[in-house]
Structure formats: structure tokens, C-alpha cells
């Protein structure tokens, strides 16, 4: 830890600006292990990230070289989520699927449903 602190450290905002990505993307890189970082106070979860310039350069080099062609094709072929066409699995059909599942899992009765607020007497085969 002291090794990192002795070098010139960068905040998350400064590191993101150097790399050319957003701060959220930089946080995701930290979670994925793409970039090495140190917390200002390692004993606190909410402690801010600290980066070195060397770690930023290494992360950029490694992130460019580790993407395979198939991953790049997947990234390029992603479609906008707000398309006009409703497909199975979207929010609209998910509601419909939940409703159908609820109907299938509902408790079934052999007889008609009875209201217990009326004075109707039940016949239990006596």
C-alpha cells in the first residue's frame, strides 16, 4: 500500500480523463479486475479509488489486446433497447408471461367459488 501511495496517485475522475472513459466505466473496470487500484482507506468500503498513471496505461494496453474479434462483433451488433418491434422476452410480453404463470399456479377448485358472506349452507355429503 505504501508503494502505491508514494507514487503520484490519481483520483477516479483524473484516471478516467487520462484513459478517455467515463468514471462509471472505470469503476466497472475495477470490479472486473481490468485495472489495478488501491483504496484510500482499505478498511472502508466507500473509500475512494486511487490509481497510478502506470496502472492506467497498462489497463488501456491490456483492454485493447484482450478483446477477441467475436467480442468486438457482439459489441457492434448490439441493438437499441427501445426498438419499435415487440419481441418475446421484452417488458410487455414479460407482464403477459407473469399473468399466464400466475393463472397456471393458482389454486384450482373443483366446485364453484363460494362467498362466505352469504347465508349459503355447505353440503359436505351428509
UniProtKB/Swiss-Prot annotation:
Region ranges (Disordered): 99-126
Keywords: DNA recombination, DNA-binding, Viral genome excision
InterPro entries: DNA-bd_dom_put_sf, Lambda_DNA-bd_dom_sf
Keyword DNA-binding: yes
Annotated SUPFAM superfamilies: Putative DNA-binding domain
Signal peptide span: none
GO molecular function: DNA binding
One Gene Ontology biological process: provirus excision
Feature: compositional bias, Polar residues: 114-126
Superkingdom classification of source: Viruses
Role description: Excisionase and integrase are necessary for the excision of prophage from the host genome by site-specific recombination.
This protein's name: Probable excisionase
Organism: Acyrthosiphon pisum secondary endosymbiont phage 1 (Bacteriophage APSE-1)
Gene this chain is encoded by: 40
Amino acid at each position: 500500500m505504501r508503494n502505491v501511495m508514494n507514487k503520484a496517485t490519481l483520483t477516479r475522475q483524473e484516471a478516467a480523463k487520462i484513459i478517455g472513459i467515463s468514471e462509471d466505466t472505470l469503476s466497472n473496470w475495477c470490479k472486473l479486475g481490468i485495472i489495478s487500484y488501491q483504496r484510500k482507506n482499505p478498511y472502508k468500503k466507500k473509500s475512494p479509488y486511487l490509481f497510478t498513471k502506470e496502472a492506467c496505461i497498462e489497463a488501456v494496453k491490456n483492454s485493447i489486446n484482450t478483446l477477441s474479434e467475436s467480442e468486438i462483433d457482439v459489441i457492434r451488433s448490439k441493438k437499441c433497447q427501445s426498438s419499435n418491434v415487440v419481441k418475446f422476452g421484452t417488458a410487455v410480453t414479460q407482464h403477459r408471461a407473469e399473468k399466464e404463470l400466475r393463472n397456471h399456479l393458482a389454486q384450482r377448485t373443483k366446485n364453484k367459488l363460494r362467498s362466505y358472506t352469504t347465508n349459503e349452507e355447505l353440503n359436505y355429503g351428509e
